[in-house]
Amino acid sequence: SFYRIYPDSTTENIKPEKILTEDSNSGYQFFDAICKEHQMQCDTANGKSNVFSYLKAHRNEKILVIADGAAFGPEMDRVLQLVQTRENLALYLPESFEWLVLSSGILKDTEIAQILQTPSDYIDSKEYFSWERYFTALLTEKTAGTYLNYTKKTLNEAYLRDGVKNAILGQMQKVELK
């Protein structure tokens, strides 16, 4: 599957008091808007290499870290060790924010559904450095000229409309934002 949640043993829903994203692009802007609706704080670590130190500095808060599974890599181990030892931490790793949007079904596009089933059949690793870049290119291409026109740097307000927003949040099983 293209997302993972830690601690993976968790049977209860994760109810964070705060969300931390790794960067300040569209994904952060999306979760920041969601957090505001629920009177929660959303912070950005301004880069995956800062996630660990942020968590060390905020040790008493219930934090959900949302980071791109595709790009998290080596930083992951240190953060995972923290998550294993602290009950107030959870880690949600979708492949990327763009993957989350694509898999939400809001685009109702059969080609996207096929690609999400077996992405490795479609991704040319010579052309795309990472899955994240591929999914970003796909989302950008599929939404160009539509009301959901996507750019990585700035979130289109259309993604915060109830139907769209709820479809995206609906992908995040076990995460409860109240």
Feature map (PLM): residue ranges:
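Hydrophobic, Leu/Ile/Phe/Ala-enriched alpha-helical segments that form helix-helix packing faces
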Residues: 34-35, 80-83, 172, 176
